[in-house]
Amino acid sequence: MNKANSLEEWIDAMRMRSIISFNGVFADRKDNIFFLHNSSSPLRKEGIDWKNIIDGTRSDLVWNEYVDFEEIPQIRNPSSGWIASTNQDPFKVTDANDNLNPADYSPTLGLQTRMTNRAYRSIELFTKYEKIGEKEFDAIKFDNRYSEQSRSYKYIANLFDREFETKELNYGIDVLKRWNLATDFENTSAALGVCVLSSEWISEQGQR
């Protein structure tokens, strides 16, 4: 990968499938950008719900090959001019008009559809600007907000219409309602917000 002198050489290196699971993003001085959902999916029988328990007595369900490199999600030079990859749904990595169509890919690939807060914020910020200079790029890079589309915010928002028995809890809800979802040092609402969010994060990771 590091020895590649062109996009084609980089793609050839990735075609080796030596480092799977990590998404790949390429950019060069010729204004090429490329996204690769770097998975290695089994070539499975169609028409089977592979998310559920599979009949282990059927030899026709045993797979012995992997899906070809060309069949995994990849985007080359989207017209939007940007790609944002943060461990998210491979069909939501650039502007909506340039994203791949999930219907073009077999469900047997088992592609993830999870969206992270970083993914939501990256897309929101990149689509906000028609042109991105150094100032705008720094603002995107050092953004410290939660997205209202994120699981994290929705977890907190579920509390907004609830009435609690104590003044302390109701005051806490008011603090969360006033929070602008930023986590800068001076933000006095962030401490409670992030503390509440920790339970959602642990739950998502399957630790509780």
Regions found by a protein language model. Give the residues of each.
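Alpha/propeptide regions of enzymes that mature by internal proteolysis
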Residues: 1-16, 122
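Long, compositionally biased non-active-site segments enriched in small/hydrophobic residues and glycine
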Residues: 28-208
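Short alpha-helical segments and helix-capping/turn motifs at coil-helix boundaries
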Residues: 7-11, 19-21, 64-71
